[in-house]
């Protein structure tokens, strides 16, 4: 085994690889406030149209650098190697926007599909009945849906999305009753959406869907250290007796809220400044979304 690993490191081959983690460029239809142009073609276009935003992302980006998943070479590579897979993870961008995804997973022989697990991370702006029908032949399919709060909070954070569309698509997939589908929520724990966690948890408790927490690391000014102590204490008090479906999620948020209970006002100022800058471009107002008590500076 050691010799095999050394050989793979010095001269890697794909002929025996069974697990693939594919980040499919930056093709995306949303402009999430915590994201960047390398993961969203919409953010890249927005930054190029509004040069004042380029400093937000550390400089300019060229879309041509992220278009490689559209190339014939990569599509042919997928068609050659994915049929041997027992695990494939698709992220983006937004993987369900990639036009050849259905053909790629259909190219896997049926006997191999029965051994293969698929995993998609998606904003669920679009649902392809054709793709979901093909999922039934696989061993298991994980769908992780990115959600930041509810209603206007989600729409502000995942700019370009509609809460009504998300709700409709969640319901549509649930009603398909795909036995091998594991359908869960990903939530980024961060300052701009922190106030909506309680309502979001209640919403997904009712849908019987579990929430997986992702602790935000970048941009650092959206870290929950930017929140007031008062806002975090309110969450802790409100969830002290919570025993619902998403107890593990709530325990995680409680833990990090306690760990970062004190406010870092430098981050608060940077958070407000960044959101204000973005609001000027998008004609939004974060003050309509985030309660003043959450980001006030005494």
Residues of each region from the PLM?
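Conserved C-terminal portion of the radical SAM core fold
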Residues: 119, 140-144, 164-297
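Core AdoMet radical
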Residues: 17-27, 38-69, 83-98, 111-128, ...
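Distinct, well-ordered alpha-helical segments
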Residues: 100-107, 129-136, 196-198
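Alpha-helical packing segments of well-folded alpha/beta enzyme cores
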Residues: 20, 74-77, 104, 166-169, ...
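N-terminal pre-core extensions flanking Radical SAM catalytic domains
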Residues: 1-65, 81-82, 248-298
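Non-transmembrane alpha-helical segments in soluble domains
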Residues: 32, 79, 102-106, 171-174, ...
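Leucine-rich repeat
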Residues: 75-81, 105-111, 134-136, 173
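Extended amphipathic secondary-structure runs
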Residues: 74-103, 284-285, 289, 295-298
């Amino acid at each position: 085994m050691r010799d095999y690993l050394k050989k793979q490191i010095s001269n890697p081959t794909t002929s025996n690889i069974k697990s693939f983690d594919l980040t499919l460029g930056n093709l995306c239809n949303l402009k999430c406030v915590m994201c960047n142009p390398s993961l969203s073609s919409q953010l890249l276009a927005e930054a190029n149209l509004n040069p004042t935003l380029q400093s937000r992302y550390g400089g300019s980006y060229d879309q041509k650098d992220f278009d490689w998943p559209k190339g014939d070479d990569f599509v042919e590579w997928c068609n050659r190697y994915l049929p041997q897979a027992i695990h494939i993870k698709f992220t983006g961008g937004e993987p369900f926007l990639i036009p050849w995804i259905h053909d790629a997973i259909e190219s896997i022989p049926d006997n191999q599909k029965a051994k293969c697990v698929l995993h998609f991370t998606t904003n669920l702006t679009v649902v392809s009945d054709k793709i979901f029908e093909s999922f039934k032949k696989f061993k298991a399919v994980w769908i992780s849906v990115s959600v930041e709060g509810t209603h206007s909070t989600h729409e502000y954070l995942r700019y370009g999305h509609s809460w009504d569309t998300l709700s409709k698509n969640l319901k549509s997939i649930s009603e398909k009753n795909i036995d091998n589908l594991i359908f869960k929520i990903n939530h980024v724990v961060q300052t701009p959406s922190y106030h909506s966690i309680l309502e979001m948890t209640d919403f997904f408790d009712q849908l019987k869907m579990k929430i997986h927490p992702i602790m935000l690391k970048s941009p650092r000014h959206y870290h929950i250290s930017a929140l007031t102590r008062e806002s975090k204490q309110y969450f802790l008090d409100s969830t002290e007796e919570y025993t619902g479906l998403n107890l593990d999620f709530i325990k995680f948020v409680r833990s990090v809220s306690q760990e970062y209970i004190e406010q870092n006002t430098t981050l608060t100022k940077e958070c407000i400044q960044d959101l204000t800058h973005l609001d000027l471009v998008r004609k939004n107002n974060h003050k309509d979304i985030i309660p003043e008590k959450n980001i006030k500076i005494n």
